[in-house]
Swiss-Prot record:
E.C. no: 4.3.1.24
Family, similarity comment: Belongs to the PAL/histidase family.
Catalytic residues of the enzyme: 113
Organismal lineage: Eukaryota, Viridiplantae, Streptophyta, Embryophyta, Tracheophyta
Location of 2,3-didehydroalanine (Ser) modifications: 208
Gene transcribed to yield this protein: PAL5
Crosslink position(s): 5-imidazolinone (Ala-Gly): 207-209
Biological or metabolic pathway of the protein: Phenylpropanoid metabolism; trans-cinnamate biosynthesis; trans-cinnamate from L-phenylalanine: step 1/1
Protein name in UniProt: Phenylalanine ammonia-lyase
Catalytic reaction list: L-phenylalanine = (E)-cinnamate + NH4(+)
Pfam families: Lyase_aromatic
GO BP terms: cinnamic acid biosynthetic process; L-phenylalanine catabolic process
PTM (free text): Contains an active site 4-methylidene-imidazol-5-one (MIO), which is formed autocatalytically by cyclization and dehydration of residues Ala-Ser-Gly.
Length: 721
């Protein structure tokens, strides 16, 4: 019994003065530790998570497991090189001490819950056959339903099962559960060999832990005939094959007293899935900040909304960081510089302030980031906790009967995370709706149509409908799970966390937000290319109008200077101010605003020409027909020529996005993923392109370009000058 394990200053198996050694006198309630975990920026934390996710080894000792490491083990199938789990050898002694204590207490006739007693509401029953009791525990908990096959809709995703196995090992390593170290080694070998038990998707209330699903891991370890597992390539394996492939040479385990309870009485399935969900949620939170900044770029937004003073006066750290990240993306942006010139040229062309979806995006996203970050820390505390019952306190020679199996931190953090994800999605939908609406988008075409004939090209209209569907489902999922608790197990489990159910619903929300983010990113790239097309076509229109004005307005019939020559400057101002896509499909149509406003300039000058209008040689009215006829003869050809040059990849004016910090995401979508500008003239549908980007979200390809956008950010807002 001299063996020991250090846990938060408490050496299990070694007598001590608990009052002096087991409590941190400076932080007895752990609030300081919780606050300290939030030090630094959220972005730095996300970068750290990504680094941890990519490490080849996860070393378990019971106290340092992270959300990113759980996600890494869970997603091993998506990696070219599998990450491996190693157990800290220093944990062996403490694990053995608690296991030995159980066997010794059994030998002494000590009455212990789950060792000599029945379970839950039937704990009044007694038995001396501890091994048989554990065997029966696993049998009666195997109450899940799978349907047909190992990949049916009623089977927990194998990634979530791997996460649960890892988290359960981490808990048991702390040496308070009364289980042999050899069983933990066997589970580790199963993980490292990619042998995954099949667990039921439903059937747990995550209090007394995740009893039903965890019993199927125990069933595999004990060789139950109904247990199922799949191998590295998804193949079904029988009981003997599982252990042989994993290199477990000891054969199936005969559970000792308490070991069955140690395997099933914990929150690992809920907290494992929550870890996976939160890894992706943190990435999506940063993505929403960057996408909001790109939205500001393509909408000719005013960057004033990111000014540090505004957010400093509001005090919320999530808001301050969100604004600072957007400010960093927009600082020096070529789009912002161009928009500033536009606003200076015609300050009344758009509202003084941008709409809420842009202007208040830091205020909207900030609280969601704080919620997701707090939930991440709560789950990290949970996956490093001892969360079963009873707890074996070797140092005080007693079993403690409590309720650490209550997974309330999981249910609450997942409900909160899901609400935050729904709020992010709502903002994304609001921004998307502005982007595709030509009443709001500052000159982009309706539906972001890029074809020559808008009557035969409806752009992203279908995608907008899909976004409404995604957003509606996401808002529905924002409803809490934890207020639907039912009293269970003869009213013994009369309050329960529903942690896994909430985690599952949050995983659904993550998938939907990835669909929304993919659709939105494709739309933003469409808008970027439309701004590029707009700039090139407008340049062609300006040059053509200038040339036609010089040719038809500058000289009179006898070679003398004509008063109409003074119209050129205002004609070019019309071109500059008029949204190109209001006339680009037929630039000389008399029903479109370009020709109407060009004519109005000439008419206004003619009205001011006074007596000179009576002279045919100096009349501006007489020049209107010649100007319009010449423009109709050359402008459509010049516009089409400019469009063809852009489509060929050799535009007169390069794409501004290459000069922006947001370029890495555009590069990913257009070059690495291989999408292109969507038009009705092509066969490819929006869904095909969005699918490519969605795949990049799902396989993690999106992460590096996202972080590259922010690689030069120093973690602080631009100082107030």
């Amino acid at each position: 019994m001299a063996s020991s394990i250090v846990q938060n200053g408490h050496v299990n198996g070694e007598a001590m003065d608990l009052c002096k050694k087991s409590i941190n006198v400076n932080d007895p309630l752990n609030w300081e530790m919780a606050a300290e975990s939030l030090r630094g920026s959220h972005l730095d934390e996300v970068k750290k998570m990504v680094d941890e996710f990519r490490k080849p080894i996860v070393k378990l000792g019971g106290e340092t497991l992270t959300v990113a490491q759980v996600a890494s083990i869970a997603n091993v199938d998506n990696k070219s090189n599998g990450v491996k789990v190693e157990l800290s050898e220093s944990a062996r002694a403490g694990v053995k001490a608690s296991s030995d204590w159980v066997m010794d207490s059994m030998g002494k006739g000590t009455d212990s819950y789950g060792v000599t007693t029945g379970f839950g509401a039937t704990s009044h029953r007694r038995t001396k056959n501890g091994g048989a009791l554990q065997k029966e525990l696993i049998r009666f908990l195997n109450a899940g339903v799978f349907g047909n096959g190992t990949e049916s809709s009623h089977t927990l995703p194998h990634s979530a099962t791997r996460a649960a196995m890892l988290v359960r090992i981490n808990t048991l390593l702390q040496g308070y559960s009364g289980i042999r170290f050899e069983i933990l080694e066997a589970i580790t070998k199963l993980i490292n060999s990619n042998i995954t038990p099949c667990l039921p998707l439903r059937g747990t209330i995550t209090a007394s832990g995740d009893l039903v699903p965890l019993s199927y891991i125990a069933g595999l370890l004990t060789g139950r005939p109904n247990s199922k597992a799949v191998g590295p390539n998804g193949e079904k394996l029988n009981a003997e094959e599982r252990f042989r492939v994993a290199g477990v040479t000891s054969g199936f385990f005969e559970l000792q007293p308490k070991e069955g309870l140690a395997l099933v009485n914990g929150t690992a399935v809920g907290s494992g899935m929550a870890s996976m969900v939160l890894f992706e949620s943190n990435i999506l939170a940063v993505m929403s900040e960057v996408l909001s900044a790109i939205f500001a770029e393509v909408m000719n937004g005013k960057p004033e909304f990111t000014d540090y003073l505004t957010h400093k006066l509001k005090h919320h750290p999530g808001q301050i960081e969100a604004a600072a990240i957007m400010e960093h993306i927009l600082d020096g942006s070529s789009y912002v510089k161009a928009a500033q010139k536009l606003h200076e040229m015609d300050p009344l062309q758009k509202p003084k302030q941008d709409r809420y979806a842009l202007r208040t995006s830091p205020q909207w996203l900030g609280p969601q980031i704080e919620v997701i970050r707090a939930a991440t820390k709560m789950i990290e505390r949970e996956i490093n906790s001892v969360n079963d019952n009873p707890l074996i306190d070797v140092s005080r020679n007693k079993a403690l009967h409590g309720g650490n199996f209550q997974g309330t931190p999981i249910g609450v953090s997942m409900d909160n995370t899901r609400l935050a994800l729904a709020s992010i999605g709502k903002l994304m939908f609001a921004q998307f709706s502005e982007l595709v609406n030509d009443y709001y988008n500052n000159g982009l075409p309706l539906n972001l149509t890029a074809g020559r004939n808008p009557s035969l090209d409806y752009g992203l209209k279908g995608a907008e409908i899909a976004m409404a569907s995604y957003c509606s489902e996401l808002q529905f999922l924002a409803n809490p799970v934890t207020n639907h608790v039912q009293s269970a197990e003869q009213h013994n489990q009369d309050v329960n966390s529903l942690g896994l159910i909430s985690a599952r619903k949050t995983a659904e929300a993550v998938d939907i937000l990835k669909l929304m983010s993919s659709t939105y990113l494709v739309a933003l790239c469409q808008a970027i290319d439309l701004r590029h097309l707009e700039e090139n076509l407008k340049n062609a229109v300006k040059n053509t109008v200038s040339q036609v004005a010089k040719k038809t307005l500058a000289m009179g019939a006898n070679g003398e200077l004509h008063p109409a020559r003074f119209c050129e400057k205002e004609l070019l101002q019309v071109v500059e101010r008029e949204y190109l896509f209001t006339y680009a499909d037929d630039p000389c149509s008399s029903t479109y605003p370009l020709m109407q406003k060009l004519r109005q300039v000439l008419v206004d000058h003619a009205m001011k020409n006074g007596e000179s209008e009576k002279n045919l040689n100096s009349s501006i009215f007489q020049k209107i027909v010649a100007f319009e006829d010449e423009l109709k003869a050359v402008l459509p050809k010049e516009v089409e020529s400019a469009r063809a040059v852009v489509e060929s990849g050799n535009p007169a004016i390069p794409n501004r996005i290459t000069e922006c910090r947001s370029y890495p995401l555009y590069r990913l979508v257009r070059q690495e993923v291989g999408t292109e500008l969507l038009t009705g003239e092509k066969v490819r549908s929006p869904g095909e392109e969005i699918d490519k980007v969605f795949t990049a979200f799902c396989n993690g390809q999106i992460i590096d370009p996202l972080l590259e956008c922010l690689k030069s950010w120093n973690g602080a807002p631009i100082p107030i000058c």
